[in-house]
A protein has these predicted regions:
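Non-heme Fe(II)/2-oxoglutarate
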Residues: 1-94
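Catalytic core of non-heme Fe(II) oxygenases with the double-stranded beta-helix
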Residues: 87-159
């Protein structure tokens, strides 16, 4: 299962983000492409910080949807009082998620990603900055997703 959200500032931010990722890229990845450091979020890049603040603001809703099989409407109040041991109606701290790693990857035609997961982390996301025509889809547990520029896709990290 995945969750998709559209970033309303993508048309303004994405060209800058693409330039930044292109300048920081360095290490080749298995399957092709180059990626930045996994600590790109610590570089003090204003555009990235703005994007990650928006993504971080979605995490409570995303985690609620993953943890709530009955599809109850999200309300932050249902998670109060928060604690390290949970809290509220659903018995977990919705504000306990932390961004551990963040990187950018660029791919050329013919490059791709080998099947992998991000275990032992709980949530992962991909944000799409630039998708030329013919770009490969994202495949999660045999679910083929055709993202659009400016979309963030959340998924469980063990996927």
């Amino acid at each position: 299962m995945h969750q998709i959200f559209d970033y309303e500032n993508a048309s303004e931010q994405n060209p800058q983000l693409y330039k930044i990722i292109s300048e920081y890229k360095g290490k080749p990845v298995v399957g092709g492409g180059c990626k930045t450091s996994i600590h790109l979020h610590h570089e003090g890049i204003e555009e990235l910080t703005t994007l990650l603040k928006w993504i971080g603001g979605l995490v409570p809703l995303v985690s609620h949807r993953y943890s709530n099989p009955s599809n109850d409407k999200f309300s932050h109040i249902d998670y109060l009082p928060p604690s390290d041991y949970g809290g509220g109606k659903y018995n977990f701290n919705i504000d306990a998620f932390k961004l551990v790693h963040c990187w950018g990857v660029t791919y050329d035609k013919g490059d791709g990603v080998e099947k992998h997961n991000h275990y032992p982390y709980a949530l992962s996301f991909c944000y799409y900055v630039n998708l030329p025509e013919g770009s490969s889809p994202l495949v999660l547990d045999n679910d083929v997703i055709y993202p659009k520029e400016g979309q963030v896709i959340f998924f469980l990290s063990n996927t």
